[in-house]
Amino acid sequence: MTEYKLVVVGAKGVGKSALTIQLIQNHFVDEYDPTIEDSYRKQVVIDGETCLLDILDTAGQEEYSAMRDQYMRTGEGFLCVFAINNTKSFEDIHQYREQIKRVKDSDDVPMVLVGNKCDLAARTVESRQAQDLARSYGIPYIKTSAKTRQGVEDAFYTLVREIRQHKLRKLNPPDESGPGCMSCKCVLS
C-alpha cells in the first residue's frame, strides 16, 4: 500500500485542523484551539488504489515557524490553505510556497491551493483572485468548507493525484533527444 505524506500549511485560524479532522473523523470542530503539530493517518481508496494518507497538521502561528523547515523536508505534498474571509492569510500563501520550494530545493513540488470557509457569506478574497494565483503557480485550486464538508475530500485527493503525477514526471523525464537540433550531430565545414 502506498503511503503519502501530506502537510497542511497556512496562517493561523484558516481551518487547517478543521479540514483535517473533517476528512479523518467526519466531524466539524467548532472551537479554535491553536495547533502546535498533529499527525493523522487514514486509509482511503483514490482512483481504485488503496493508500495511506499520513497528514501533518501544522502550526500557523509565527512563533512556531522554526519547526516548518523540518516538516517541509519530509512532506511529499502540501495543502496551502487560506480563509476566503481573511485577505492576509491569502497574501501569506506566497511565503509558504517560497519556503516549501527553498526547503525542498525545487520549483516542482506538489501543492494544492485551498480556499477554506466558503460557506461564509462574508468574503474578502474573490474566487477569481485565488484561481489566478493557482494558475500562476501551476497548481490546482479547490474551494472548501470544513463546516459543510464541501471540497474536503477533493482537496486531499487532488493533492495525492498531484504527488502521483510528480513521481511519474521524475521517473519519465521529458525526452531530450526528440526532433530538432539536439537529436542530430551536425558537422559544419
UniProtKB/Swiss-Prot annotation:
Reactions catalysed, semicolon-separated, are: GTP + H2O = GDP + phosphate + H(+)
Q: Name one GO molecular function term.
A: GTP binding
What EC identifiers does the entry list? 3.6.5.2
Q: Where is this motif: Effector region?
A: 32-40
Which ranges are cleaved off as propeptide?
187-189
| Location in or out of the cell | Host cell membrane
> Broadest EC class?
hydrolase
The entry's GTP-binding residues are 10-17, 57-61, 116-119
Q: Per its Swiss-Prot or TrEMBL record, what regulates the activity?
A: Alternates between an inactive form bound to GDP and an active form bound to GTP. Activated by a guanine nucleotide-exchange factor (GEF) and inactivated by a GTPase-activating protein (GAP).
**Domain of life of the organism in this record?**
Viruses
> Which membrane topology term applies here?
Lipid-anchor
* Residue numbers with lipid attached (S-farnesyl cysteine): 186
The protein's predominant localisation is host cell
The record's PROSITE patterns line, in alphabetical order, gives:
RAS
Keywords of the record, alphabetical order, are: GTP-binding, Host cell membrane, Host membrane, Hydrolase, Lipoprotein, Membrane, Methylation, Nucleotide-binding, Oncogene, Palmitate, Prenylation
Residue positions of S-palmitoyl cysteine lipidation? Answer: 181, 184
> Biological process GO terms, please?
signal transduction
* Gene Ontology CC terms: host cell plasma membrane; membrane
- Which sequence positions carry the modification called Cysteine methyl ester? 186
- Supply the PANTHER family for this chain: RAS, DI-RAS, AND RHEB FAMILY MEMBERS OF SMALL GTPASE SUPERFAMILY (PTHR24070)
User: What family does this belong to?
Assistant: Belongs to the small GTPase superfamily. Ras family.
Further information in the entry reads: This p21 transforming protein was generated by a transduction of rodent cellular H-ras-1 gene.
The protein in question is named GTPase HRas
Q: What is the lineage of its organism?
A: Viruses, Riboviria, Pararnavirae, Artverviricota, Revtraviricetes
